[in-house]
């Protein structure tokens, strides 16, 4: 298994499928990295030499791709900024509701979490069968 930018790349996969394991690199960026590093996209990650790994890292840094921890931190800071200025999107993040205008009267279960069932309190007489 090759280690690129602190991430273990699965060795049995081709580069075009293995590079997207890195957070911030998708299939199109993986293809671009392979072209610029002059590597065959179908080459297995386990067959990479140290020189080729260094070339991949160099291409990622030269293009200014923000990946892994830096990207996660940047996204988190953007959300915190929205929350601190109390804009609509920030308030939606705070309340745990959909941010991009989706409906919430029904659906939105992923964002809202599982349903919270609310029980009904009944009078003691109603339990005994008396009205």
UniProtKB/Swiss-Prot annotation:
Keyword vocabulary terms for this entry: Ribonucleoprotein, Ribosomal protein, RNA-binding, rRNA-binding, tRNA-binding
Recorded superkingdom: Bacteria
GO molecular function terms attached to this record: rRNA binding; structural constituent of ribosome; tRNA binding
GO BP annotations, alphabetical order: translation
GO CC annotations, alphabetized: cytosol; small ribosomal subunit
Subunit structure comment from the entry: Part of the 30S ribosomal subunit. Forms a loose heterodimer with protein S19. Forms two bridges to the 50S subunit in the 70S ribosome.
Physiological role: Located at the top of the head of the 30S subunit, it contacts several helices of the 16S rRNA. In the 70S ribosome it contacts the 23S rRNA (bridge B1a) and protein L5 of the 50S subunit (bridge B1b), connecting the 2 subunits; these bridges are implicated in subunit movement. Contacts the tRNAs in the A and P-sites.
Similarity comment: Belongs to the universal ribosomal protein uS13 family.
Protein name: Small ribosomal subunit protein uS13
Annotated organism of origin: Methylacidiphilum infernorum (isolate V4)
């Amino acid at each position: 298994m090759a280690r690129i930018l602190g991430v273990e790349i699965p060795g049995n996969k081709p580069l075009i499928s293995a590079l997207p394991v890195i957070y911030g690199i998708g299939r199109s960026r993986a293809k671009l990295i392979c072209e610029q590093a002059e590597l065959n996209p179908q080459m297995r990650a386990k067959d990479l030499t140290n020189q080729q790994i260094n070339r991949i890292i160099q291409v990622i840094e030269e293009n200014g791709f923000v990946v892994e921890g830096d990207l996660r931190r940047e996204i988190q800071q953007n959300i915190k900024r929205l929350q601190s200025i109390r804009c609509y999107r920030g308030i939606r993040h705070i309340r745990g509701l959909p941010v991009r205008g989706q409906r919430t009267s029904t659906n939105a279960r992923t964002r809202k979490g599982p349903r919270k069932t609310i029980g009904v309190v009944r009078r003691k007489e109603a339990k005994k069968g008396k009205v």
